[in-house]
A protein has these predicted regions:
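Rossmann-fold dinucleotide-binding core
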Residues: 107-185
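Active-site-proximal catalytic alpha-helix in oxidoreductases
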Residues: 15, 139-148, 168, 173, ...
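Helix N-cap / loop-to-helix initiation motif
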Residues: 33, 154, 204-208
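NAD(P)+-binding Rossmann beta1-loop-alpha1 motif at the extreme N-terminus of oxidoreductases
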Residues: 1-50
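Hydrophobic/aromatic beta-strand patches that form the interior of the parallel beta-sheet core
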Residues: 28, 67, 81, 131-133, ...
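Rossmann-like NAD(P)-binding element
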Residues: 32-35, 49-108, 115
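NAD(P)-dependent Rossmann-like dehydrogenase/reductase catalytic/cofactor-binding core
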Residues: 2, 23, 170, 201, ...
Length: 304
C-alpha cells in the first residue's frame, strides 16, 4: 500500500495521517468540518515533532494534503481509514460513499473503538475488503494497533494490513474474534468500571485513584502483560484471592451515575474544560505536552 486516505480529522485523524506519511505513504485527508481542516495542520506538525523525538525514520515523500471534497481525497487510494464518530449508520454511510469512488482492491479500514466489524461490513457492497484497524490514542505514540477481521474479511486483506502496519514501525495485533470492544477497550472499560465504582462508593478520591493505578498496576503492566503477571505472582495466589474478591467486584451493565451526571451538564473533560477535574486552556496545553513527553520516554524505555 502506497496511497492512503484518512477520513475524519478529529482526535485520531491527524496522528494517524502523520504516522502513515512518516512511513513513506502518500497521504490525503478529509473532514466535512472546515474548522477541523484548518486546524489539522497543527496536529500534523505536533505529531511529526513527536515522531522525530522517537527517532522514527522520516521517509516522507510529500506533505499531507487536506481536502474538502471526499472524492478528491480518496482518488487513487489503496487504503482508506475512517475515523468518524462512533455511530454505526454513519460509518456504513461513509464506506458506501467511498466504495463508489475507489478501486475494487482498495482496503477500507475502520478505526472504530468497539463496533463489531461484521456489523459495519454487513452494510457495505464489498464486505470482503472491510477490516478493523483500531489505533490507541495518541496514535502516533502508542505503537499497538488492533487488526480486526470481520466474518467476511478476506484473508489477504488481513495480511496486507499487518504488513502495512509493520512498515510504520507500529505493532499489529490480530484479534481472533470480532467481539464488541475488541480486546484493548474490553480490558480498559472493565478497569474503568471498577475505578468509577470505587470513587462512587467513597473508597478513594479521583486524585488518589489516579496515583494508585499509575504508580501501582499501571507501572507493572507497562513492562509485564496481565498473563505473564499471573505467572510471576503465582496462579495459586490468583486462585486464592480471586476466590473471595471476584464476587465483590463491580458487574454493573449501565454507565455510572458519576459519569452520566457530568455528561448531562456537558462536562466532557478536556474538550469542554471540565470533567472529573477542571481545566484552563493553559492547563490543557501543559497536560498534553507532558503526556506526550512521558509517553515518548516510556516507549523509548520499553524499546531499549
Amino acid at each position: 500500500m502506497k496511497n492512503a486516505a484518512v477520513i475524519g480529522l478529529g482526535t485520531m485523524g491527524p496522528g494517524i495521517a502523520a504516522t502513515l506519511a512518516r512511513a513513506g505513504m502518500t497521504v490525503s485527508a478529509f473532514d466535512a468540518d472546515a474548522a477541523k481542516r484548518t486546524k489539522a495542520g497543527q496536529g500534523f506538525a505536533a505529531a511529526a515533532a513527536v515522531l522525530s523525538a522517537l527517532a522514527v525514520p522520516d521517509l516522507t515523500t510529500r506533505g499531507i494534503v487536506v481536502h474538502g471534497n471526499l472524492s478528491q481525497c480518496v482518488a487513487g487510494a489503496d487504503l482508506v481509514i475512517e475515523t468518524v464518530p462512533e455511530d454505526l449508520d454513519l460509518k456504513i454511510q461513509v464506506f458506501r460513499e467511498i466504495e463508489a469512488l475507489v478501486a475494487e482492491d482498495c482496503i477500507l479500514a475502520s478505526d472504530t473503538s468497539g463496533i463489531p466489524i461484521t456489523r459495519i461490513q454487513a452494510g457495505t457492497l464489498t464486505p470482503s475488503r472491510v477490516i478493523g484497524m483500531h489505533w490507541s490514542n495518541p496514535p502516533h505514540i502508542i505503537p499497538m494497533i488492533e487488526v480486526i477481521p470481520g466474518e467476511m474479511t478476506a484473508p489477504g486483506v488481513v495480511t496486507s494490513m499487518v504488513e502495512a502496519i509493520r512498515r510504520t514501525g507500529h505493532l499489529p495485533i490480530i484479534i481472533r474474534k470480532d467481539v464488541p470492544g475488541f480486546v484493548e477497550n474490553r480490558v480498559l472499560y472493565a478497569v474503568m468500571r471498577e475505578c468509577l465504582d470505587l470513587v462512587e462508593q467513597g473508597v478513594i478520591s479521583p486524585e488518589d485513584l489516579d496515583a494508585c493505578v499509575s504508580w501501582g498496576i499501571g507501572y507493572k503492566l507497562a513492562v509485564v502483560g496481565p498473563m505473564a503477571l499471573l505467572d510471576m505472582a503465582g496462579l495459586d495466589i490468583y486462585a486464592a484471592v480471586g476466590g473471595y474478591l471476584n464476587k465483590e467486584l463491580s458487574n454493573r451493565s449501565d454507565v455510572a451515575a458519576y459519569i452520566m451526571e457530568r455528561t448531562s451538564q456537558r462536562k466532557l473533560g478536556l474538550k469542554s474544560g471540565s470533567g472529573i477535574y477542571e481545566y484552563t486552556p493553559e492547563k490543557i496545553a501543559e497536560l498534553q505536552g507532558r503526556r506526550a513527553r512521558k509517553l515518548v520516554a516510556v516507549r523509548k524505555a520499553l524499546q531499549a
